[in-house]
Amino acid sequence: MADRATHHRWEDLPREALNPKIGRRFITGDSMMIAHIYLDKGAIVPKHEHENEQLTYVLEGRLRFALGADGDQVVDVAAGEVLLIPAHLPHSAEALEDTLDVDVFHPPRQDWLDGDDAYLR
C-alpha cells in the first residue's frame, strides 16, 4: 500500500498507441486505475467484459455503447456525461466523433498492466 501521494500531469505520461484509431495514458494506484482514452471518429472497441467496475466520463466527443450479452442496450454518451458499467457486463463502444474520455476502473485492469489486452490492438 502506498503511503505517499503522487502527482501526475497527463501530458507528461507516455501516450500508448493501441491501434491507428485508439490511444491511452493511465495511472494506477493500489486499488484503482484512471485512464485517458483517445478515440478517432469511427474507432471501435470490440465487445469484451472484465472483472472491473468501470466509470466512463466523456470529456470531448461522443461514444455509442452496446451493453449486455446481445448488445441490445444501446446508450450514447456525450461530453459531460458518465456511464457506469458493472463488473462482468459485456460491452462494446464506437466513437461517433473524435473523443477523449476518462475511464476509472476498480480494481486496476491487470490485463492492461500485463499488456494482455489484444482485443484493443
Give a label for each model feature.
Residues I44-P46, R64, L83-S92:
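Histidine-centered metal-chelating micro-motifs
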Residues R25-F26, I37-Y38, V45-H50, L67, ...:
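Short histidine-centered beta-strand/loop micro-motifs
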Residues G71-A87:
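Short acidic-glycine-tyrosine-enriched beta hairpin
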